[in-house]
């Protein structure tokens, strides 16, 4: 599956070339360079990269702003008045005056600077001029930094000590006694032991080495306006990293050096290590950026800036991009290995792997594999281009995604298979339906991606597994907008406008459904994701209407269905 965005049109045409992954045995010395597509409003969300479900109920993916700076106001606003600027004034200008002109007026012959993603052309990129705060500002992000780790511990306690039920005070137990008891359970069962630290960080370092040393392809990122259109190279070795990790994990398990079910046995301590690591790495990332003067779009509010991040493109050795590294290898690899560990534990205890655990193992493998085989498409996403490397990205990838989305697996691993056994006919149906929806999901995003690549002359064919039928449309039907951009009205996007969201939600619901309804915690991810994806779909629709105008109205007329051909349609 590939997931790309449209480009600006500045990329020169080039011939389609077959993709490759180099064989192991030597360090890659030459990697194909592919120019990443620019993001367009109609494909702002990618299944393999955006479904990561970060805690963004009010997601930050704002459309690139090209409106003019407002009468001397934008240039001095800087989100809380940084560097001694007061009352919204900058560079010594007062009362909203810009460039020496009074009352905020500019010379009619002088072109006003554009505001691009919080940066005013020609201004200091270290300052955020957008005037916008997400998640309720400093108080909101502080609540999230405190609340989500507590929620993770609460769900873990419920899963382990309350048989998957909500922990609540027992009869006659005061709230203070209940909270003290909860704290005792965390100290007793989730103490960050040395063994847990070694497991977590050996995996972390190993994956970093795989990122740098294994074969892959190099992809050029989107142009960065504040750097004069400079494009950064991104090295994509996810496919080799994933399969190398699986092979080594198998060797360690079968030789007895490290049994895979150790991940299940040590889940509590690993949870604490991941949470602590999320905070530690966030502190190092923030203060090292300040010390090196590498901060970008800062508001001057330290709690908020710590959460959103200080540095835009943190790198090591010129090849290891930390945002790229954290995006796939840590969250989705860990989630897959937790499911693999559950299967190993079940086989150790019962002598077989239940169909329900096998279902989750299949689902998590397909998802992690999809992220890897389309890794070159991540470089054009909003996370890589706009989001800074702060607590939001760091904590969510180190702890939030792998250790809160896994409760479906934890529930199955903690209970006898007889307690959640589905009817065998229904289970076969779940497998078949899931694989069908995966095909729709994969080919939907592939059609969108390859349409954009063909349009810009950057089509690259990679023979990564799995290659599925109907991934590429020949002479697809399109609608041309007034600005010359095209809307794909063919293939799956000729049937429903957000059909890839339908698939995403189907996956999430199945992860909960396979566990049954005895515990609420496996349903945390499906419910959270359903709320997020609904909000995102409505937001995307509005952005597309603004971008494409009458062309989008025509698209809605030709394709009236939003999610599936019988679903709600916006009008």
Curated annotation (Swiss-Prot):
Phenotype on disruption: Deletion of both erg4A and erg4B results in fluffy colonies with severely impaired conidiation and increased susceptibility to antifungal azoles itraconazole and voriconazole, but does not affect virulence. The double deletion leads also to the loss of ergosterol production and accumulation of the ergosta-5,7,22,24(28)-tetraenol precursor.
GO cellular component: endoplasmic reticulum membrane
Protein name: Delta(24(24(1)))-sterol reductase erg4B
Source organism of this protein record: Aspergillus fumigatus (strain ATCC MYA-4609 / CBS 101355 / FGSC A1100 / Af293)
Composition bias type Basic residues, residue spans: 54-63
Primary localization: endoplasmic reticulum
Function according to Swiss-Prot or TrEMBL: Delta(24(24(1)))-sterol reductase; part of the third module of ergosterol biosynthesis pathway that includes the late steps of the pathway. Catalyzes the last step of ergosterol biosynthesis by converting ergosta-5,7,22,24(28)-tetraen-3beta-ol into ergosterol. The third module or late pathway involves the ergosterol synthesis itself through consecutive reactions that mainly occur in the endoplasmic reticulum (ER) membrane. Firstly, the squalene synthase erg9 catalyzes the condensation of 2 farnesyl pyrophosphate moieties to form squalene, which is the precursor of all steroids.
InterPro entries: ERG24_DHCR-like, Sterol_reductase_CS
Entries under PANTHER family matching the protein: DELTA(14)-STEROL REDUCTASE, STEROL REDUCTASE (EUROFUNG)
């Amino acid at each position: 599956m590939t997931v790309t965005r449209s480009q600006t049109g500045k990329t020169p045409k080039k011939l389609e070339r077959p993709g490759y992954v180099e064989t192991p045995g030597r360090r890659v010395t030459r990697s194909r360079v592919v120019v990443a597509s620019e993001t367009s409003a109609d494909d702002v969300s990618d299944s393999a990269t955006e479904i990561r479900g970060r805690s963004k109920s009010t997601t930050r993916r704002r459309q690139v702003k090209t409106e003019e700076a407002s009468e001397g106001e934008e240039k001095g606003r800087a989100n809380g008045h940084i560097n001694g600027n007061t009352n919204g004034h900058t560079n010594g200008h007062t009362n909203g005056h810009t460039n020496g002109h009074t009352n905020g007026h500019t010379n009619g012959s002088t072109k006003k600077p554009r505001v691009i993603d919080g940066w005013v052309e020609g201004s200091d990129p270290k300052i955020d001029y957008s005037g916008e705060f997400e998640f309720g500002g400093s108080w909101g992000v502080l609540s999230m930094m405190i609340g989500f780790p507590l929620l993770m511990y609460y769900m873990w306690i419920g899963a382990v000590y309350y048989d998957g039920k909500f922990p609540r005070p027992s009869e006659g137990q005061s709230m203070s006694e209940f909270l003290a008891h909860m704290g005792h359970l965390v100290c007793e069962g989730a103490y960050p032991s040395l063994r847990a630290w070694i497991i977590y960080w050996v995996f972390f370092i190993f994956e970093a080495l795989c990122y740098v040393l294994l074969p892959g392809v190099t992809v050029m990122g989107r142009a960065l306006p504040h750097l004069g259109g400079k494009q950064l190279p991104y090295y994509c070795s996810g496919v080799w990293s994933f399969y190398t990790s699986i092979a080594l994990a198998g060797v360690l398990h079968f030789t007895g050096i490290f049994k895979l079910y150790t991940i299940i046995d040590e889940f509590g301590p690993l949870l604490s290590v991941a949470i602590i690591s999320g905070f530690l790495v966030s502190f190092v990332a923030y203060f090292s950026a300040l010390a090196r003067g590498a901060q970008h779009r800062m508001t001057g509010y330290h709690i908020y800036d710590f959460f959103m991040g200080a540095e835009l493109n943190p790198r090591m050795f010129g090849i290891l991009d930390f945002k790229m590294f954290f995006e796939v290898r840590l969250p989705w690899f860990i989630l897959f290995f937790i499911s693999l560990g559950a299967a190993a534990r079940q086989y150790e205890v019962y002598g077989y792997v239940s169909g329900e655990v096998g279902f989750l193992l299949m689902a998590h493998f397909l998802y992690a594999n999809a992220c890897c085989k389309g890794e070159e498409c991540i470089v054009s996403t909003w996370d890589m281009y706009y989001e800074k490397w702060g607590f939001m990205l760091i904590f969510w990838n180190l702890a939030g995604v792998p250790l809160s989305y896994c409760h479906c697996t934890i529930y199955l691993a903690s209970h006898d298979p007889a307690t959640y056994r589905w009817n065998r006919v229904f289970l076969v149906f779940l497998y078949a339906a899931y694989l069908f929806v995966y095909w729709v999901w994969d080919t939907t995003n592939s059609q969108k991606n390859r349409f954009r690549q063909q349009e810009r002359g950057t089509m690259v064919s990679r023979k990564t597994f799995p290659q599925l039928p109907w991934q590429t449309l020949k002479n697809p039907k399109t609608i041309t907008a007034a600005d010359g951009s095209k809307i794909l009205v063919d293939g799956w996007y000729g049937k429903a406008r957000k059909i890839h969201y339908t698939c995403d939600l189907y996956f999430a619901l199945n992860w909960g459904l396979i566990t049954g309804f005895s515990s609420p915690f496996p349903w945390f991810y499906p419910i959270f994701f359903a709320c997020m994806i609904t909000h995102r779909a409505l937001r995307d629709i509005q952005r597309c209407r603004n971008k494409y105008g009458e062309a989008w109205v025509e698209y809605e007329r030709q394709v009236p269905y939003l999610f599936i051909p019988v679903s709600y349609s916006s009008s």
